[in-house]
Amino acid sequence: MRSSLYRLGIVLLSVAAPIETGCAQTLLHLPPADRVRLAEGRQLATRVCDRIWPGWGQTKFQVLLVGDSAEFLVAPERHPRGFTPLGHDAVLGAEVWTRPRQFSPDLLATFPAVGGVPTVVIGSAERTGKSSTAWVLTLLHEHFHQWQFSQPDYNGGVSRLGLARGDTTGQWMLDYPFPYDSAPVQEAMRSLAAALVQALEAQSETRGRALQAVSESRDRLRKLLTADDHRYFEFQLWQEGGARFIQYAVARAAAATGEPSADFRRLPDYEPYGQAAEDAIRGLRSELEKLDLARQRRVAFYPIGAALALLLDETREDWKQEYTRRPFRLPDLASAGR
């Protein structure tokens, strides 16, 4: 039986843009700015992945860049069907293949798009509305999803959550009927978000109490949810909140490991990684303060999960091992900082 992740990929394929045919429609080279960004992302992954997360650096990094008329497959795991080889790209340090565009050029997702392999499918920085630095950090966010999906029991574990309710496409991951419009759940979510802001800003002498308040808020929310709703909530915190945390961690690690390439720094919208990390944390606090479950739906879970992961990173030495051993739920917070 094919995995839910594979079936979700089929859903995305079914809504992809029509294939454009004809040699004139197909670009035979990567646009220069896209090559520079991809090269920076690949080099950054080599520098920081294993510093940030045990074993992440061993994860395959297959990327499908979606241009306006062509797609470029970078570092495929195996010979891809339906693609034309462009050869080894010395800047990227990888083989590159191309085909006419199939996916929307503003897509940002990771799923088995090519050869059944979890693939980062990503439009250009311009098409996705991101600066070059933000685009690279998003690329690493999606690369962490590749690590998640590569875990030995990912597909089996997702199936055992029992949340599909007859869906065979994987669409339930996006459309699960969580009680977004419940007033008590909305209030509990706002309380949890407020407690997370307080904990992120707490000084050492008040950190223990602030963490306890987060744990109590998390427990109050759990009591309002059915068992299925709670499993879905925790699954989203683990998967999407964890990947959002990775963006902050990558920005911090990148700032500490030297400057990016001169070509990347010359891009007109380049922002230093240290500044990007500071902006991201400020943005996270703003998201938590303005959290609106009824309007944001599933996306409201992302800053909650990211904030919990940041606190775990400060309070539990073993949280990454626990995250891997017991997937689909973020570990509990420690009672005080380490």
List PLM regions with ranges:
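Extended hydrophobic/aromatic segments used for targeting, binding, or gating
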Residues: A254-E314
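Active-site recognition of the HExxH zinc-binding catalytic motif
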Residues: L137-F149
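Catalytic zinc-binding patch centered on the HExxH motif and its immediate surroundings
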Residues: G82, V96-V117
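N-terminal mature-domain "stem" immediately C-terminal to a signal peptide or N-terminal signal-anchor/transmembrane
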Residues: Q25-A94, A243
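Short pre-active-site segment immediately N-terminal to the catalytic Zn-binding motif
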Residues: S124-L139
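Non-catalytic terminal regions of proteins
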Residues: L28-D50, A94, I281, D292-R295, ...
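Bacterial N-terminal signal peptides
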Residues: G9-E20
